[in-house]
């Protein structure tokens, strides 16, 4: 009887691992169908009680695996640009820009996960799939991300994604008008405007 219980536990573990592996493979495969795209997005942030904290909108350009431009236009403008080596964050309101090496940037944020779409990143999560919905839970609790959900059509179109932080704050993004195809290289370059304070962390 004890042997049967042990075998049953092993089979359950094997099946669960296979499901997670299949979900991760399907998610990566879907995202791989689109190598570059532009989409507009709306953002809604709520606290742990479901109260609205912020609403915003902007545009997103991605050319996988390492080029992207995340441009928040409302309520306050901010820009996150990767040229493949350097990750720039620019806040026009305070006239400050920060430069970090992309390889040193955290990979446990929803946007980085989507833009990079790397197997090594997905392996850090337990992934469950329900149709076009994928729910990701970090295997370790070291970071601030508690859960990440993304809806991706079979053709690679990202419809929405959301992130829940450890304090239960939820950030939801609805993407629309995704256009696949070539993107002007200028979208993935950034030069700090004159007079902007630059915090260059690339050599620290």
From Swiss-Prot:
Region (Disordered): 169-204
Cysteines joined through disulfide linkages: none
A GO cellular component entry from the record: outer membrane-bounded periplasmic space
Signal peptide: 1-21
CDD domains recorded: LolA
Primary location recorded for the protein, binned into one broad class: periplasm
Quaternary structure annotation from Swiss-Prot or TrEMBL: Monomer.
Protein name: Outer-membrane lipoprotein carrier protein
Species whose genome carries this gene: Enterobacter sp. (strain 638)
Gene giving rise to this polypeptide: lolA
